[in-house]
From Swiss-Prot:
PANTHER family: CHOLESTEROL OXIDASE, FAD-DEPENDENT OXIDOREDUCTASE 2 FAD BINDING DOMAIN-CONTAINING PROTEIN. This is Cholesterol oxidase. GO terms for biological process: cholesterol catabolic process. Its EC number is 1.1.3.6, 5.3.3.1. It is found in: Secreted. Can successfully induce the immune response both in vitro and in vivo.
Amino acid sequence: MKPDYDVLIIGSGFGGSVTALRLTEKGYRVGVLEAGRRFSDEEFAKTSWDLRKFLWAPRLGCYGIQRIHPLRNVMILAGAGVGGGSLNYANTLYVPPEPFFADQQWSHITDWRGELMPHYQQAQRMLGVVQNPTFTDADRIVKEVADEMGFGDTWVPTPVGVFFGPDGTKTPGKTVPDPYFGGAGPARTGCLECGCCMTGCRHGAKNTLVKNYLGLAESAGAQVIPMTTVKGFERRSDGLWEVRTVRTGSWLRRDRRTFTATQLVLAAGTWGTQHLLFKMRDRGRLPGLSKRLGVLTRTNSESIVGAATLKVNPDLDLTHGVAITSSIHPTADTHIEPVRYGKGSNAMGLLQTLMTDGSGPQGTDVPRWRQLLQTASQDPRGTIRMLNPRQWSERTVIALVMQHLDNSITTFTKRGKLGIRWYSSKQGHGEPNPTWIPIGNQVTRRIAAKIDGVAGGTWGELFNIPLTAHFLGGAVIGDDPEHGVIDPYHRVYGYPTLYVVDGAAISANLGVNPSLSIAAQAERAASLWPNKGETDRRPPQGEPYRRLAPIQPAHPVVPADAPGALRWLPIDPVSNAG
């Protein structure tokens, strides 16, 4: 029986979209299953208060782009929709510093910097990475704080995947023919710098995956099936993978479908991929899965805090610019970025409360809830105004704090009283996953003082549950199943026709925004696949790792003379954060 697809990909984010394009170019019949809906530019929410288009909560009739997932040790922000996290991410595309490549989990396998750099460079071109050209009010404030604290020389503008205009110009609102792919891609419109990147770009400036990898894959024959939630999968006796799905949000039997494929790629985002692997293991569908599943789950050692004024300052436009416009490095292992939402997008302000400190040498033994009450009692009216989400985006500088330290949590499933298995977490390998980052709080308090505002954290921090937008790992690369879930070619140990190609395969904390790394790892993984019908040069599982040369696709979509053409060259230093 002929399968529905040669390759079926679950998820359409950075890993899934890269894989879809490159394997379509190699002649495979590719299908992509996406739980979320498809958006045209004008269909994105005008503000984050349009919850049906912004928030992901299918049981409530909300099919937006913003997922929020709670875990015991962390609260997670993620993406949804055709294009995955590219729809609501902050456009920021850094190459990580050296500790990522040298992490003890995988550094002994190969020279990862040497192997991955050509693929980082290719992903940069595909995603249209340029240096942010605008120095905003938030950048000025952050730069002044960095200067005063002695690390002003670390301030840099961010590398972003945004179209500002042709040939390095800024032409806001002007539409031009495809500037990246020699006519194979869509027309693009110059960025308005309205700050609405994370609610969905309505202007055609953000280089989402729909504008590049995924859109090109579809034009070459890949089939994207939206509003399709995967309920389970298993390998049949004939070797094919059978994937059971239901129409997202439906409870009806008639909305169930089954797909078959020779090869199956999990790219459902770290949360989604981990959930599927745990579920299939617990139900006996993947009995040979490595016991390392869930180990080395990372949060990017992250904290999301911020500073807010009590009323809008007419002399400060904190919504101007793309979502993230600059970076500072207060310590060798800490990276802070100012973040913004556009005017009117204030719903995420409901996550904010007053800043509190955790325990430890630089902290306090006072419980965080008590700190909150003490601070609030000093200025009750000011606290109420600070917590009011009205005009929150116009009053707030969000501070995204990341580190490339070796800490992690371990995710696992446990059976509850009703026999239902629950997904949970605990502290993992290395140093404890931070519940707060002291230098992040210090910098944020300085920012608050600069704007005559109040420093804030998130409600989860009162219970030592930080917020992260970068949930990673848990199905990491190892040199055998005792040390990893997947091999260095991204094949799941024990199941060589099952792959993990998304954030779950990130094997160490990055200390920078992860999207470029996910794309680069996916580029490398797909480059090692043979063209359809040719001999697979990857060694069988169980044999020692061999470094292989990338295999050019037989049917490239992008013309060879276009900026985004597939070619492996040294990396552009603009986005090297090392």
